[in-house]
Structure formats: C-alpha cells, structure tokens
C-alpha cells in the first residue's frame, strides 16, 4: 500500500457526517417522550383527554392516530377539540398498549430506532421515511 494516500481522520469524518444531518435531527437534544394518555371512563364512553398532545409528540396527524386506535379497538369515536371520545369502556392499560403499537409501526424507524420519521406516499404505497438515517420502510395503509 502506498504511503501517499491521505486518509481522513476520525474527527473530520465525524464532522462531515454531522453536517449532512437534517436540522431537526441535529437539534434533537432531548429524549423522545410521549405523554402518557389521560384516560377517563364516563358511563359507556372512554375519553382520552390529551389525544392531540400525544399525536403532536409523535409528530403525526391526530386523524391518522385516531383511525389506528379506532381500528385496533373496533369501535366508533370522534375527535372533539384536543380530546377523543370512544364508544365503549377501554382501560388505560389497553389504550397505552395501542399507542405503543402505533409508535412501533408508524413512528419509530425500524433501521436506526429514531423517532424522526414521516409518512410518505409513493404511487399507491406508503413508506415510513427516517430523517435521521434516510431509510424507507413500507408500512400498511390505514
């Protein structure tokens, strides 16, 4: 091997990689946290008081998250203001599990584990595009 080859040192390569990252990934200093669901059962209805806050923390459209929850618990429901009213009695534990499932399937990148993703449509297919690593993973359309 020739001695004249100029190899990048680790620090310069690291700086170059950091410059290539999107701004929202660079500025992501805090840990990704989704607020726990505030669930109230009133009669034969279940109310998720902070539903829009949860959707915003996941960086998802509340209507997409609502559609997922309604399919998972097989019921009807409506978005009223910042809360959701579901027909039927559902435990806070069940709601939390459904939110975790949504996170796993529609938010967290399966390649690098980053929450910095968005849902994109290409032709008839939907993909989870990671803004941190650039991976595109096909997802099921709701």
Swiss-Prot record:
Coiled coil stretches, renumbered: none
**GO MF entries:** translation initiation factor activity
Note the InterPro entries from the entry: IF2/IF5, TIF2_bsu_arc, Transl_init_fac_IF2/IF5_dom, Transl_init_fac_IF2/IF5_N, Transl_init_fac_IF2/IF5_Zn-bd
Question: What is the name of the protein in this document?
Answer: Translation initiation factor 2 subunit beta
The cross-references to SUPFAM superfamilies, in alphabetical order and at most eight, read: Translation initiation factor 2 beta, aIF2beta, N-terminal domain, Zinc-binding domain of translation initiation factor 2 beta
Describe the function of this protein. eIF-2 functions in the early steps of protein synthesis by forming a ternary complex with GTP and initiator tRNA.
Gene that this sequence comes from = eif2b
NCBIfam families hit by this protein: aIF-2beta, PRK03988.1
The family line of this record is: Belongs to the eIF-2-beta/eIF-5 family.
List the keywords (alphabetical): Initiation factor, Protein biosynthesis
Subunit structure as annotated in this protein's UniProt entry: Heterotrimer composed of an alpha, a beta and a gamma chain.
Q: Which domain of life is it from?
A: Archaea
């Amino acid at each position: 091997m020739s001695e004249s080859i100029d190899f990048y040192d680790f620090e310069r390569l690291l700086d170059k990689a950091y410059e290539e990252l999107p701004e929202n990934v660079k500025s992501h200093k805090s840990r990704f946290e989704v607020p726990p669901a505030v669930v109230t059962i009133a009669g034969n209805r279940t109310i998720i008081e902070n539903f829009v806050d949860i959707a915003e923390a996941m960086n998802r459209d509340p209507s997409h998250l609502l559609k997922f929850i309604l399919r998972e618990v097989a019921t009807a429901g409506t978005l009223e203001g910042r809360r959701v009213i579901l027909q039927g009695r559902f435990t806070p534990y069940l709601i939390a599990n459904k939110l975790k499932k949504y996170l796993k399937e529609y938010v967290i990148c399966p390649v690098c584990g980053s929450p910095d993703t968005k849902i994109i449509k290409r032709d008839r297919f939907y993909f989870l595009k990671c803004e941190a690593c650039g991976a595109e993973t096909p997802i099921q359309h709701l």
